[in-house]
Curated annotation (Swiss-Prot):
It comes from Methanococcoides burtonii (strain DSM 6242 / NBRC 107633 / OCM 468 / ACE-M). CDD domains: NAD_bind_Shikimate_DH. The active site is at residue 66. This is Shikimate dehydrogenase (NADP(+)). Belongs to the shikimate dehydrogenase family. NADP(+) binds at residues 124-128, 147-152, 211, 234. The keyword NADP applies. Its EC number is 1.1.1.25. It is an enzyme of class 1 (oxidoreductase). GO terms for molecular function: NADP binding; shikimate 3-dehydrogenase (NADP+) activity.
Length: 269
């Protein structure tokens, strides 16, 4: 019997998860299918119980359901710290995970950049920043967070423990002591062509990762190129967070190259 997987959210029409996961199932000749369903916050508990009752293999969650889901699932320790769920597995109850930070970590490691003991500066203090900050702290990075509202950055840093929070003006002094710069804000998304950091503030040993993947080469990454730094695009974070969910659900090694090719073709990159 065909196993069903899905992503839930509102809005959901934009999601690339169905085409990415269906390409993976097809590549491994698995009798599975992946769909997208619009689910509002107030309906999430019923949706989770319904999916479990109908024998779904697993779910992904996107905006605005990630935080709400904590009330209804058995979250693993990392997801509980992050305070958000993006992956649900039904093999043993309703288990919740967060693979966003893992997606970012694998993307950067793919570029040959080791995270342990590195000084990381994360721009933003929202959901993606939380996932990346906690995951990188667990991996042994020295985490720094800069946010438009410094209090939010300091609050997140305090939750992590061994981290520091600042206002965005921290970048004005230059990034000589930073090894990895990560943008988790929406600055640079779409046609905005904005950046929070310029080439003059960077150095050539810096790795610059932007989780925005549309456009692929954001203004921030263009500035990184100008500075002779290493630009890392956000597209593989999307692929790797999905690949980790695939691994959790199926126990199989996901076909990363197939998933990447499908996403890039869909985005016409």
């Amino acid at each position: 019997m065909k196993k069903i997987f899905a992503v839930l959210g509102d809005p959901i029409e934009h999601s690339l998860s169905p085409i990415m996961h269906n390409s993976a199932f097809e590549a491994l000749d698995m009798d599975c299918t992946y769909h997208a369903f619009r689910v509002e916050k107030n309906d999430l508990e019923n949706a989770l119980q319904g999916a479990k009752a109908m024998g779904f293999g697993g779910l992904n969650l996107t905006v605005p359901l990630k935080e709400t889901a904590l009330k209804f699932v058995d979250a693993d320790s990392l997801a509980a710290k992050i305070g958000a769920i993006n992956t649900i597995d039904f093999k043993d109850g309703i288990k919740g995970y967060n693979t966003d930070g893992i997606g970012a970590k694998r993307t950067i490691e793919d570029e040959g950049v080791d995270i342990k003991d590195k000084n990381v500066l994360i721009l933003g203090a929202g959901g993606a920043a939380r996932a990346i900050a906690f995951t990188f702290a667990e991996a042994g990075a020295n985490v720094n967070i800069a946010n438009r509202t410094p209090e939010r950055a300091m609050q997140l840093a305090a939750e992590i423990g061994d981290a520091k929070g600042y206002g965005l003006d921290i970048v004005d002094n230059g990034l000589e002591d930073i090894d990895i710069l990560i943008n988790t804000t929406t600055v640079g998304l779409g046609n905005s062509n904005g950046t929070l950091v310029t080439a003059e503030q960077m150095h050539s040993d810096l790795a610059v990762f932007d989780i925005v993947y549309n456009p692929l080469m954001t203004k921030l990454l263009q500035e990184a190129e100008t500075a002779g730094a290493r630009p890392i695009t956000g597209i593989m974070m999307l692929v790797y967070q999905g690949a980790e969910a695939f691994r959790i659900w199926t126990g199989k090694e996901p076909p990363i190259n197939v998933m990447k090719k499908t996403v890039m073709e869909t985005l016409d990159i």
